[in-house]
Amino acid sequence: MNIRHFFWALAVAALLPAVAQAGGKGPEWLSKAVFYQIYPSSYMDSNGDGVGDLPGIASRLDYLKQLGVNALWLNPVYESGWFDGGYDIIDFYKVDPRFGNNDDLVRLVDEAHKRGMKVCLDLVAGHSSDKCQWFVESQQGTNGRYSDYYIWSDTIGKKDAADIARRRQAEDPKASTIGHWVEADAPRGKYYYKNYYECQPALNYGYAHPSASRPWEQGVDAPGPQAVRRELRNIMAFWMDKGVDGFRVDMAASLVKGDKDKKATMQLWGEMRRWLDEHYPQNVLISEWSYPQQSILAGFNIDFEIHIGRSAYSSLFFQGDTPWGKTKKIDNCYFNRLGKGSLKDFINIYAADYNATKDRGYIAIPTANHDFQRPNVGTRNSPDQLKVAMTFFLTMPGVPFIYYGDELGMKYQDGIAPKEGSRNRAGSRTPMQWTPGPTAGFSTCAPAQLYFPVATDGGKLTVEAEEKDPGSMLNYVKRLLALRASVPALGNDAGWQLLNTLDGEQYPMVYLRTAASGERCLVALNPSEKAVTLRTGQPAGKVLVSTGKGSYKHGTVKLAPFSAIIVRL
């Protein structure tokens, strides 16, 4: 642990007395959970309109069961203004007509449960659409039910006024994320506070340190912020009473404003977790936070270790010549054919997070998601390379999350025209590829009607083709998931120890997984185009699964380019 992470751990420890602890890691089913994320508009279209829907997802549950996943996370399915891919919600209690209706969601959940699968929804807790009835009524004055559901002001500072002026100069001001205040000139106030786009007014959870000189800053215990908390619980209860098993919370760290150390936000989620444990003990909360030492301490069962804020995930997967590599200014990521990456950034961050949270909750390292590029991007594009990456994703501790299509090796399709706020994220939202053809079996519509076009690999990377090929990516993923389910040392709760020294050889990556029973497995990964060797100092063992060419003899790992092995010691 480097000095920066040491002091961060001390800071977290200092918060322990202030943040009342929620109970344990959560329901028992999490110990064997494997999640599959579905972007509903792009998974399966049941009615030929070119957009995926809930009956379409239900029709593919048997495929998901056979794959080996046992939990689903659906991106937002609520009624939306569709300016930001469903994250601008008009009605939190209603399924958007493009996906079906509330009964369709209940049927999907029921059918999933019959197959032993859980279903979690996306909870967009921080904002609504400006078309939401709460916001429409909030504008009308100071004495209404929803007047303080949002943050209003009649005055703003010079910097905020300058941000508004800059946003006006943008090519599309409504699609600009510059600044936070939006001109409204409504009876309730001249300005409202937005989270991202103008159409996404921030819900008012209060300010951590309100100032009398800024009258719009209400404390977290003020009536408005407390009413918003009750509404959030009502939304959760509404869907959980219909059978939903939990929620992934969008931008969970952002709710309380002016909360630099996140203490007030952590207290909010601790309150939610205690409520959940009391009333819905078999349900879960998953955070988009990417700081597990905060989120899991606050009460979340799972947090993602992704690209937000810190470099752990980015240093592994975002090569410099790919869209997210350019944004993050990373020259050489670890999972790249050149073999010039380093484990240091990932391990320094991940090891600290893992050791601090392993007894409280789970870290998830997803294959990708709707907000960033897939593993198949740039020069990391062959099945051999992608199998090595998938070996990593499916043998690390915590809860695996597979983004739809990554089990096939679907590519991030650069250059797709943006739609509904997708920007360059469109390349990760193309239709699921079921069968060869112009619509990849996703829809019966004409190709021009598709929500997004099929990626250019759609003719060869399909479920139909890969199911028939014993050496396919899909069948390799099935083998990995079956192994994870049957070998306790590879499970969600088993221990983890890196065998590389960070100042020594970086390739291959080698780590141990250890079950409570003492059973141990060694995992070795070589994502580079060079043959590599590492002496591990471990005893003899038996290779359980491999991809590419590799050996394990007398404690020494030898791996050909783009190879991985899993050894039971």
Predicted regions and their residues:
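Bacterial N-terminal signal peptides
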Residues: A9-P17
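Acidic/aromatic-lined carbohydrate-recognition and catalytic surfaces
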Residues: G23-A227, D241, A252-F300, M432
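Conserved alpha/beta catalytic core and glycan-binding cleft of carbohydrate-active enzymes
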Residues: D130-K131, F135-D172, W269, R273-P431, ...
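Glycine-rich phosphate/pyrophosphate-binding loop
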Residues: G189-Q218, T439-L474, K478-R479, L483
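Glycan-recognition and catalytic regions of carbohydrate-active enzymes
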Residues: P453-C521
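Asparagine-centered strand-capping/turn motif at beta-strand->loop junctions
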Residues: A524-S528
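Beta-strand-rich binding/interaction modules
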Residues: K530-G548
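C-terminal beta-strand-rich structural cap/linker in extracellular carbohydrate-active enzymes
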Residues: K553-L569
